[in-house]
């Protein structure tokens, strides 16, 4: 009868104090040993016989390099530089440079004395415009004949003396062969027989007279060559006319 009277509720009430004391003991134990619990847990996970070593990382060592000693000197003072005159520039479209960069450019710049190519090109263009104002060349038509000086060719005689005398009479009226006389000898430079200006007092020698005189000289020269066997000079002044 007593065994039937014990129910699950009674059994629970009997076991309740035992469970409470067990939980209290566990809580106190946990509070007192937190570090030891962690160490024991890690040891339980990894047995002592097996040791895991971390991988060793080898870093290559660079050899020690000896650098030379560097001695610092105070900066040298630059000599005073004179400002270089520059051409004025328009203010409207001018591009301002920083002051530091402009000073460095002034210090390093050197005056150049070279001819500018664009200026030469402009001069050539101005000359072309002056020569051809409209830009076109003036071409003459084929119908208009070109003005070419016509030189009349005189017949060349067989005798060189006659040719020279005729040429002097026809082309050059100022200089003619003058027969030998005292006036011509005095008018020449050193008394030699040369071409001299004809004075207005002397009468001009006609062609017929010159031709006759030259033919006589040629005949005389031929006779002298037959007798003496020597060559006479190619050119001689005319003899005095009577």
Swiss-Prot record:
One Pfam family this sequence matches: LAT
Cell compartment(s), UniProt: Cell membrane
Region (Disordered): 78-118, 176-242
Topology, Cytoplasmic side: 29-242
Record-given protein name: Linker for activation of T-cells family member 1
Gene Ontology MF terms: protein kinase binding; signaling receptor complex adaptor activity
Role played: Required for TCR (T-cell antigen receptor)- and pre-TCR-mediated signaling, both in mature T-cells and during their development. Involved in FCGR3 (low affinity immunoglobulin gamma Fc region receptor III)-mediated signaling in natural killer cells and FCER1 (high affinity immunoglobulin epsilon receptor)-mediated signaling in mast cells.
Location of Phosphotyrosine modifications: 175, 235
Expression sites by tissue: Expressed in T-cells and mast cells.
């Amino acid at each position: 009868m007593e065994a039937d009277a014990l129910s699950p509720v009674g059994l629970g009430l009997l076991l309740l104090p035992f469970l409470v004391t067990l939980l209290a003991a566990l809580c106190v134990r946990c509070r007192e040993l937190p570090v030891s619990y962690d160490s024991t847990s890690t040891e339980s996970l990894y047995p002592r016989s097996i040791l895991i070593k971390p991988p060793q990382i080898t870093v290559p060592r660079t050899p020690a390099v000896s650098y030379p000693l560097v001695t610092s000197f105070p900066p040298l003072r630059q000599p005073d530089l004179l400002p270089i005159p520059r051409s004025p520039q328009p203010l409207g479209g001018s591009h301002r440079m920083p002051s530091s960069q402009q000073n460095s450019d002034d210090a390093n710049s050197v005056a150049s004395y070279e001819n500018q190519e664009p200026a030469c090109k402009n001069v050539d263009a101005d000359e072309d415009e002056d020569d051809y104002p409209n830009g076109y060349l003036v071409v003459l038509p084929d119908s208009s004949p070109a003005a070419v000086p016509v030189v009349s060719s005189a017949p060349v005689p067989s005798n060189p003396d006659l040719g020279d005398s005729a040429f002097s009479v026809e082309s050059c009226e100022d200089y003619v062969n003058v027969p030998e006389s005292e006036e011509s000898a005095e008018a020449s430079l050193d008394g030699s027989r040369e071409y001299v200006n004809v004075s207005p007092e002397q009468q001009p020698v006609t062609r017929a007279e010159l031709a006759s005189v030259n033919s006589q000289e040629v005949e005389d020269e031929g006779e002298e060559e037959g007798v003496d066997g020597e060559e006479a000079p190619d050119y001689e002044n005319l003899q005095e006319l009577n």
